[in-house]
C-alpha cells in the first residue's frame, strides 16, 4: 500500500444534529486513515486508495447506500428519512468511492427537505486545505 498525507473535511449529520466525532472513541483507529482526538471534522489519510466505506467502518460507523450504523443503531432510508452521501456537492451511491485530498464529505440522515439539507451543507467543515498548508500538514 502506498503512502500519502492527505486531509478530507467530514460531517456526519443525523436527525438534525452533527455527530460529535471529537470523542475519544473515534480517535486514531488506524494508522492508514484516522481522526485525531479533538479534530473530528478532519480525516487524516496516510495511505492511498482508502474507500469511504472502510474509513467509516474503522470509526464503528458502517455505511451502505441506504443505511448507517451508529454504535449498533441502524438508521435506514424509509418513507420519512433518507440517507445521502454527498462528496464535493455530488450525491454518490458507491460507498467504496476512494477518498481524495481535500474532499468535502457530508453523510446525511434525515427528512431530506431543502431547509435541513441546506443547514447540513452549511456545517461541512472547511479545514482540509488550511491544514495541508501548515508545516508537516498539521501532524
Where are these regions (language model features)?
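Ubiquitin-like/PB1-type beta-grasp interaction modules and other compact soluble beta-rich domains
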Residues: 1-139
Amino acid at each position: 500500500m502506498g503512502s500519502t498525507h492527505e486531509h478530507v473535511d467530514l460531517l456526519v449529520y443525523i436527525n438534525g444534529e452533527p455527530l460529535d466525532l471529537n470523542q475519544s472513541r473515534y480517535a486514531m483507529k488506524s494508522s492508514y486513515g484516522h481522526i485525531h482526538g479533538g479534530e473530528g471534522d478532519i480525516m487524516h489519510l496516510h495511505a492511498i486508495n482508502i474507500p469511504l466505506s472502510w474509513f467509516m467502518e474503522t470509526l464503528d460507523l458502517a455505511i451502505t447506500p441506504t443505511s448507517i450504523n451508529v454504535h449498533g443503531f441502524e438508521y435506514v432510508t424509509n418513507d420519512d428519512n433518507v440517507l445521502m452521501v454527498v462528496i464535493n456537492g455530488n450525491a454518490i451511491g458507491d460507498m467504496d468511492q476512494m477518498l481524495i485530498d481535500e474532499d468535502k464529505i457530508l453523510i446525511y440522515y434525515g427528512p431530506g427537505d431543502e431547509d435541513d439539507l441546506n443547514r447540513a451543507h452549511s456545517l461541512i467543515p472547511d479545514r482540509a486545505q488550511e491544514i495541508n498548508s501548515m508545516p508537516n500538514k498539521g501532524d
